[in-house]
Amino acid sequence: MRKSRKYLLGLLLTGGLFSLSSCRHMEMSNDQWREIIQNIYPVDSIDSQHTWNLLQDKALTVRVKIADPNITTVQVLNGNPYITEGVEILAERPCTTGHYVSPTFKVPNVAPTLYAAAINSDGRYYVVPVDGANDVTIGGSRVINDGTLYQPTYQTFTYLFEEDYPFPGDFDFNDVVMRISQHAANDSTLKLTVTLAAVGATKQVGAAIRLPNINYDYVKSVTIDEGTRFDENYGINRYFISNDEIYSRGRDGSAVINLFDDAHWCMNAKEEMGQVVRMYYNTRKYEAENESAIVPAVSRTYTINMKSNVNAYYQSLALIDPFIIVSNNGLCVEVHTYRYKYDEAIWHYTNGSAGMDDRVPWALLIPDATFHYPVEGITMGMYRDGQISGAYSRYNHSFGQWGRNRSTSKDWWLYENATKAQVY
């Protein structure tokens, strides 16, 4: 935390902005809070209707009419896997020849070119372009099924978090960076893969994922494919997630996947004098002793076995609720994406928006598996007093302009719009 942020934090506390009614509960002075945030946030004149959403809904009916009797699955793809590497699976349903499926799914607001594919039991793909249609048939001369297949992977989102919520931070959105995908292994089994890509926080940070559409009572078991937790052998008492179980019941009754209690430990399981070593991991392009390090990302895949009440194929990645947990002013505070900003998955610490929603996110969902987040100390994008700057500041394709008007610069997050020296 920079000195200016420490000074502001002191003003917030000594000025009585926050009143504490318990160690887990805070109340905010609405007018003061709104004024401070609007004066500090990198974007002034924020769109009053902004939801910080980069996704849009799609629906497609796919009919399978090919001679192969061994078709088992239909997928909707964001590219042609016989031509392009890195194609993602946006939707997947069991299906056989002579039948159809009608999946709904999410795509980025910068809409990709869609393809539909039928896959047989040997993994052979029969692909057709969707061409903007709402109803497409896999069959006839349009089918592509020859050449080298680049195996598609499941749709992956990047989640970016600021550690200082509810206080203003530097808004480089790299304090914790996670990349998450999910898919159904069968009707009752959901696979959730989480990659911890970077930690730019200066203090201990925990994390979990709430599954708002899956009741805790509908889960039979959760296992980790790798056999160990993110923070296996963590030698210090757990602070944010006291339950040693892999999953637990959320405050609203939903299932919560407990990821880790200390992000730094997950990236580098090292202690000195009984304290976890805290450095910047993968947020600077150089290494500095005791300050920053470049390390491999860490991944875990969670297998969620569910009762018949839930069909895994109908669970949307866009609706999960990853969040981090931090300690601010003695409170255990959760940092959620804007959709779930005032939800409390594990801890109770606020009275909700209480009419003081300032339209400001402390976490972002980016619909890109390889999103290049800002390097340490560089804001995602700034637009104040007519000046545009930051990691994503290309004119008419900038984060700041999108913040002012949700209908413009919707492609700001594409790598082509980044200031390359300012992103990781």
Language-model features, listed with the residues they occupy:
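Structural beta-strand segments of beta-rich domains
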Residues: 56-58, 188-192
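A eukaryote-biased signal for long
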Residues: 252-424
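Bacterial Sec-dependent N-terminal signal peptides
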Residues: 18-46
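Solvent-exposed beta-hairpin/edge-strand motifs
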Residues: 209-244
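Structural motif
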Residues: 48-50, 61-70, 168
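Short Pro-Gly-centered beta-turn/loop motif in secreted/extracellular proteins
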Residues: 94-115, 120, 128-132, 137-144
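Sec-dependent bacterial lipoprotein signal peptides
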Residues: 1-21
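Short, ordered, surface-exposed loop/turn motifs in non-cytosolic proteins
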Residues: 55-58, 66-88, 173, 204-206
